[in-house]
Amino acid sequence: MKMRAVAVFTGMLTGVLSVAGLLSAGAYAAGGEGNMSASATETNARVFSLHLGATRVVYNPASSGETLTVINDQDYPMLVQSEVLSEDQKSPAPFVVTPPLFRLDGQQSSRLRIVRTGGEFPPDRESLQWICVKGIPPKEGDRWAEGKDGEKKADKVSLNVQLSVSSCIKLFVRPPAVKGRPDDVAGKVEWQRAGNRLKGVNPTPFYINLSTLTVGGKEVKEREYIAPFSSREYPLPAGHRVRFSGR
């Protein structure tokens, strides 16, 4: 699973206070009689991340869709935004996720439905897309983020640090002609020397994801997956034996 995080900083003093104005607010709080005391200043940090019910989704092009469970492990609500991206994670893939945006309360779960909307995929091998799910924090004034009583605390100087996390898992489009499982064919990967590089050749219709790749007792960190019927090179210290394990 891949994760991207974006930090959002907000501050509030009986409504709105910018981060840049925090120092002046602190000085105000420590000021003369009738002002807020320093003890009324608080810092809150919240992570808006979601737990996904699977590490990958296998999609049969002939099916009517697949589902993915999304869990909010936090004690506060957040918006859930989902999309499917192409293999390079830069452009939209021909899939739709429903609902695309919704509120998920704390300690609750829901299901996403992924449906293909078009696109051409090779009939003899897997294709890789990415399902990305992001937890979105509220903006100042968002009513969906209010408490059960509909009120917000307005008597404290506060600095809110909100971390929005996007989690992406693999979506494998596996046509009916591709039989078996990747675990059954991982041992068929052929390893070759290519100068000071190690070349892995994948003769199978599956994406081979290397969970570990060890050379001379040292783990190779650059161990990206090997696409079907293709190859990938990895750095290789000379004169070492290779061990690997795949998904």
Curated annotation (Swiss-Prot):
Gene3D superfamilies: Immunoglobulins. Its main location: periplasm. It comes from the Bacteria. Residues 1-29 form the signal peptide. Keywords: Chaperone, Immunoglobulin domain, Periplasm, Plasmid, Signal. GO terms for biological process: cell wall organization; chaperone-mediated protein folding. It is found in: Periplasm. GO terms for cellular component: outer membrane-bounded periplasmic space. Belongs to the periplasmic pilus chaperone family. Involved in the biogenesis of the AFA-III afimbrial adhesin. This is Chaperone protein AfaB. It comes from Escherichia coli. The gene is afaB.
